Amino acid sequence: SPKYIERFGTPRSLKSLKDHFQVHYCQQLGRENDYFEYMEEGKIKKVRTKALVSVNSTEAYTAACLEGLGIIQAPYSGLRDSLEKGDLVEVLKKYKAEAMGVYFLYSNRKFLARRVRVFMEWVEPYVKDYIYS
């Protein structure tokens, strides 16, 4: 966020991350993601980071970033409005994390209703456009 950049500056390289803070996300108590993840030559790479705060919800993750408590890595689609309004600023653009999957949940593949399959085929291009634009 601009608040973070004003306080700590803008990270310009992976090496500079040692001088910055990331909001750590933990799905399970005591098991936080304490790294910045990126893809290089088709492989996932990680740089260990320090944090001012660790959270366990996506709402708190984004809120902590907006308040200037650290850098986050999140899908563009979830931050689009904040980025367009200038509430958040993209940094280290060339270091993209592995793409997250989007899944359909349905009761049984063996007896998948035709209307469910048709809906999945219809919605797929819209979801792709939203996520990757």
Residue map of PLM features:
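Hydrophobic hinge/microswitch elements
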Residues: K45-E90, A97
